């Protein structure tokens, strides 16, 4: 095989709609260009600095064909490893290298992996409203579009606060009440099953908003409504409590969007404490570790439901689809409709058809970035209030 030398590495940050999006572009001596997602929307400048100041000089002159070696080198070169900044930066490069290899092979990415194990991947989307009437309207709309898996949320994460009993002059933050959230969410499940029966699979994201003992009770309360899975019922530092949940309920659990380090998921998979792995592909370092994780999960009967939120480039979402049509144990793909500006910046962004996503058949990933259009949407940053989630007494809680 002829060498393909890396000649330049770019990091483009843009905000076409609500979220800061980060793309890495790798250039080579034969003109083949690769694109990858490196989005860590809460810290975009940190990722750009990592790529521009540290990874770029490390990579220029290297052979782009040696993806495994380059991934290992990038991960250990700083000695400290497996954090969200370095992992996303490495991911952007890693995806771009796979994109280059697939383009040079003149095949879509999933064929480079070994081909398809399914025609398309089932999709779930988000129905969210502050009222049941609004939630019904959203669900009805998605059912008409062909969705048969819908994540249902009554209000933002933590629910709709009602008459919060806060302190005098409360600290700035996003307040919620755990007891109200649990009561309202269990009622939501009940009403949805009464209205729709089994017309669609219900998913729900707890988003770590409960204490572990509350999470155990919540899982027991919603079990009879047969959710497809409950997402992030516990934070990564409290996963030992999964044994308590497993021993008391059969509710399906999806976990992993905050994971960065293999030690966070290894024992959960081997001991079958979860049903679905929810890792965010760029947060774990890209395609190279995602393939390994997917195969590990298959060995232990754990299915794949990658985290695929709107704060991810359509490049990253397309990578998820390629992984999902290839990996035999892939179950479902999260999807939120792209807005017009995002589509302009990322030509080729895909949309579901009748509740399924189909992988691009173009060579490579199939989605790129228009850097000229991206420049029209500069990144803006302000401290996020929603990640300053607080209980009524002012205690900060995992967001």
Curated annotation (Swiss-Prot):
The keyword Magnesium belongs to this UniProt entry's keyword annotation: yes
Listed InterPro entries: D-mannonate_dehydratase-like, DgoD-like, Enolase-like_C_sf, Enolase-like_N, Enolase_C-like, Mandel_Rmase/mucon_lact_enz_CS, Mandelate_racemase_C, Mandelate_racemase_N_dom
SMART domains: MR_MLE
Function as written in the Swiss-Prot or TrEMBL entry: Has no detectable activity with D-mannonate and with a panel of 70 other acid sugars (in vitro), in spite of the conservation of the residues that are expected to be important for catalytic activity and cofactor binding. May have evolved a divergent function.
Key words of the record: Magnesium, Metal-binding
Lineage: Bacteria, Pseudomonadati, Pseudomonadota, Gammaproteobacteria, Vibrionales
Molecular-function GO terms, alphabetical: magnesium ion binding
Positions with a binding annotation for D-arabinonate: 207, 257, 278, 307, 334
Protein residues bound to Mg(2+): 205, 231, 257
Residue pairs linked by disulfide bridges in the UniProt entry: none
Protein name: D-galactonate dehydratase family member VIC002985
Pfam families from the UniProt entry: MR_MLE_C, MR_MLE_N
Classification via PANTHER family: D-GALACTONATE DEHYDRATASE-RELATED, STARVATION-SENSING PROTEIN RSPA
GO biological process: amino acid catabolic process
UniProt KW Phosphoprotein keyword: no
Family note: Belongs to the mandelate racemase/muconate lactonizing enzyme family. GalD subfamily.
């Amino acid at each position: 095989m002829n060498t393909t030398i890396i000649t330049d590495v770019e990091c483009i940050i843009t905000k076409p709609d609500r979220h800061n999006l980060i793309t890495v572009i790798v250039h080579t001596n034969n003109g083949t260009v690769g694109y990858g997602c490196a989005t860590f929307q809460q810290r975009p400048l940190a990722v750009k600095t990592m790529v521009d100041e540290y990874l770029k000089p490390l990579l220029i002159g290297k052979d782009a064909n040696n993806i495994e070696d380059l991934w290992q080198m990038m991960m250990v070169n700083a000695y400290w490893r497996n954090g969200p900044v370095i992992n996303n930066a490495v991911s952007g490069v890693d995806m771009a290298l796979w994109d280059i290899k697939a383009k040079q092979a003149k095949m879509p990415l999933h064929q480079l992996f070994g081909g398809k194990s399914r025609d398309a991947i089932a999709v779930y989307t988000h129905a969210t409203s502050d009222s049941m009437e609004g939630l019904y309207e959203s669900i009805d709309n998605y059912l008409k579009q062909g969705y048969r898996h819908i994540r249902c949320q009554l209000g933002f994460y933590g629910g709709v606060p009602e008459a919060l009993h806060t302190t005098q002059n409360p600290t700035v933050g996003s307040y919620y009440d755990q007891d109200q959230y649990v009561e309202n969410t269990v009622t939501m499940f009940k009403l949805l099953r009464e209205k729709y029966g089994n017309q669609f699979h219900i998913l729900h994201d707890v988003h770590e908003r409960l204490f572990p003992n509350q999470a155990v009770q919540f899982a027991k309360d919603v079990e009879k409504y047969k959710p497809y899975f409950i997402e992030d019922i516990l934070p990564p530092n409290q996963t030992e409590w999964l044994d308590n949940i497993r021993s008391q309920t059969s509710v399906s659990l999806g976990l992993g969007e905050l994971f960065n380090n293999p030690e966070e998921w290894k024992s959960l998979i081997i001991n079958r404490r979860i049903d679905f792995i929810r890792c965010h592909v760029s947060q774990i370092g890209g395609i190279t570790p995602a393939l390994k994780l997917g195969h590990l999960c298959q060995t232990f009967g754990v299915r794949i439901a990658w985290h695929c939120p709107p704060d991810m480039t359509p490049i990253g979402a397309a990578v998820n689809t390629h992984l999902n049509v290839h990996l035999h144990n892939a179950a479902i793909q999260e999807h939120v409709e792209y807005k017009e500006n995002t589509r302009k910046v990322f030509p080729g962004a895909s949309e579901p058809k009748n509740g399924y996503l189909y992988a691009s058949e173009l060579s490579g990933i199939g989605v790129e970035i228009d850097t000229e259009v991206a420049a029209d949407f500069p990144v803006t940053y302000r401290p996020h209030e929603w990640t300053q989630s607080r209980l009524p007494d002012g205690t900060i809680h995992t967001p």
